[in-house]
Amino acid sequence: MARGSAVAWAAFGPLLWGCALGLQGGMLYPQESRSRERKELDGLWSFRADFSDNRRRGFEEQWYRRPLRESGPTLDMPVPSSFNDISQDWRLRHFVGWVWYEREVILPERWTQDLHTRVVLRIGSAHSYAIVWVNGVDTLEHEGGYLPFEADISNLVQVGPLPSRLRITIAINNTLTPTTLPPGTIQYMNDTSKYPKGYFVQNTYFDFFNYAGLQRSVLLYTTPTTYIDDITVTTGVEQDSGLVNYQISVKGSNLFELEARLLDAENKVVANGTGTQGQLKVPGASLWWPYLMHERPAYLYSLEVRLTAQTSLGPVSDFYSLPVGIRTVAVTESQFLINGKPFYFHGVNKHEDADIRGKGFDWPLLVKDFNLLRWLGANAFRTSHYPYAEEVLQMCDRHGIVVIDECPGVGLALPQFFNNVSLHHHMRVMEEVVRRDKNHPAVVMWSVANEPASHLESAGYYLKMVIAHTKALDPSRPVTFVSNSNYAADKGAPYVDVICLNSYYSWYHDYGHLELIQLQLATQFENWYKKYQKPIIQSEYGAETIAGFHQDPPLMFTEEYQKSLLEQYHLGLDQKRRKYVVGELIWNFADFMTEQSLTRVLGNKKGIFTRQRQPKSAAFLLRERYWKIANETRYPHSVAKSQCLENSPFT
């Protein structure tokens, strides 16, 4: 890839890369329309963990063939949520193996009687391996958490005499192995003087709790039997016009017509097209800008697609509306450009994590987090260390929060994790990530891994292949991974478009010595930039802080130490910010749960907010910095105003 001049991925406008996906079928977000219905299955499910020694009792006794309550005692389990923190059973919190969920559903009669209707079961995520049965029939399997999967169950609900209720059974195994993402190992403790026979532990190589279960929504939705299966959109700018290139996939018939209309925010039609692919030109287009970068950020159009088809059962129609943000992304050797303007990431790393619900999706928590991001003046975050719920990305699109979209490639710490089976799975996961998230304007870069052992020769080949595969899937966005390796030893850095670095000076290194941060940070930046000539993001930095701990002069774990550490980092960042450093993402937005260890007191405490989303002292420091940066980088240059209520306790 050429350096020195902007590499504008949007220049691939007519190239519709969706067809490069190896997966069969699209993964459009289920929505209601004139032709589509949805029935959410959130709420209480029956739940049972298989505590048998071999964790196989559920399969041996075929729990899926009859109501789960007939197999033995069950619990009420809320969906979505992680199962770990719901009960008072300590065994369940750290359970490794198969758990079983079940829900009985009554379908609308028209879903079962109308043969024009296609009925689909969709699971938002199931960590990590899932098998699904409908009325005892093996319907679907999926490997990997954090991403949706679905199955057409029309043939199970529209054929023959139907039971009064539809019984959905889902078995989930959260075991991590050397070939899962994230990877892990199972260690058997064979010393029978210390451990019972068959005792084992799950070893993980990442610093967050391995929550599991049905952590996102489960739902049923319908489409016509001939339907819009997928839409791929890329955008560009030509002089003062916006370009929207689209490709539409249809399944169920070869005899159909397609109409595409682009509507502005006032629901006025600004462009029309027909056929499965085309380009819509929007004179004087309103571009999608990040939050605080423009007076009118996050402008969204709507691409309305109408399908009409002739089938053996008669004419059918299908309708789907896709939000579209017109924007470009480009990278030079020292800048990250959005719509041709230098963009500086001033934001956070996050986790999907909260009390009780674990990694379960929660609307109040989502809205609270976005209010805090806006109050903070943050314009970006990384989905550390896995793809977040689709609803999160939709909020980012609407609010202008830029996203580095990361796959679950975290914990790749051992040589045995870089094997061909893992590589194949990793590439497939990237296909699923791109398929799901490709149309979000907020997503400006893919991250294929966090802190892999990238000094290994095997890791170099592995990362090269995953990055190349991701670029082939989506030429419209840059690709990176997040490194904590030495600049001279990193085997994956030559293949990324942007260097992302994690470093914890005066915390994990030379802890307590705040006076060393500026020198060490400057050395880090200069070494990496001299070798690779690529823009750099400080993708992690921070300090563990127990809310309410105070000491002056600052000592580790106090709020004063976290503030002082951030101040020293900021001085170092400012020395390079106008040169080739293009972003800073604090670790972390909020405290989060981890496995128990001697260095973790009820989880990781590096958040600038507590797990309950209350601010530590550093939150106010970071807020002051981010609003200052926002006013320096805004286009056009008008003063940004703090987004908080007049009576906010944070003002």
UniProtKB/Swiss-Prot annotation:
Gene Ontology CC entries for this record: extracellular space; lysosome
Catalysis: reaction(s): a beta-D-glucuronoside + H2O = D-glucuronate + an alcohol
EC number: 3.2.1.31
Activity control, per UniProt: Inhibited by L-aspartic acid.
Signal peptide per UniProt: 1-22
GO biological process: carbohydrate metabolic process; glucuronoside catabolic process
Active site per the UniProt annotation: E451
InterPro entries: Beta-gal/glucu_dom_sf, Galactose-bd-like_sf, Glyco_hydro_2, Glyco_hydro_2_AS, Glyco_hydro_2_cat, Glyco_hydro_2_CS, Glyco_hydro_2_Ig-like, Glyco_hydro_2_N
Cell location: Lysosome
Residue spans crossing the bilayer: none
Glycosylation sites recorded in the entry for this protein: N173, N190, N272, N420, N631
Alphabetized UniProt keyword annotations: Glycoprotein, Glycosidase, Hydrolase, Lysosome, Signal
GO terms of molecular function: beta-glucuronidase activity; carbohydrate binding; signaling receptor binding
Chief localisation class: other
Protein family (similarity comment): Belongs to the glycosyl hydrolase 2 family.
Assembly and oligomerization: Homotetramer.
Function of the protein: Plays an important role in the degradation of dermatan and keratan sulfates.
Protein name (record): Beta-glucuronidase
Source organism (scientific name): Pongo abelii (Sumatran orangutan)
